Amino acid sequence: MVTFALPFFMIEVREYVDAKGRSLYRDWLVKLDAATIARVIAAVLRMEGGNFSAAKAVGAGVSELRLDFGPGYRVYFGKDGEQLVILLAGGSKKRQQADIEAAHMLWNEYKRRKREK
């Protein structure tokens, strides 16, 4: 009998907290209803397991996790290496361009603060 073991590792997911202690992702998430929050968290948990099938790059190191329900929710994130995801912001399809611009700004801030440590 031959068995095969696939390498398995979890992706660490963290929220980005700015210098003032704020998380744009958290600020967005807590405004949603409980059922929507549960679906967003389930999607983020799938990313922890390595499932990025609903993600699409939006430039400058930022990607969006597309959630196909409601108004087309999005979670914006950056990958810091292979095993760390930084949640930057959330939004909907309606505000997509403004949310992408905010996520780019936060990602640049994250990288700058990381270099300064």
Spans of model-derived segments:
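Basic, Lys/Arg-enriched alpha-helical interface segments
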Residues: 1-71, 81-85, 92-117
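Short, surface-exposed beta-strand/loop micro-motifs that present aromatic residues
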Residues: 74-78
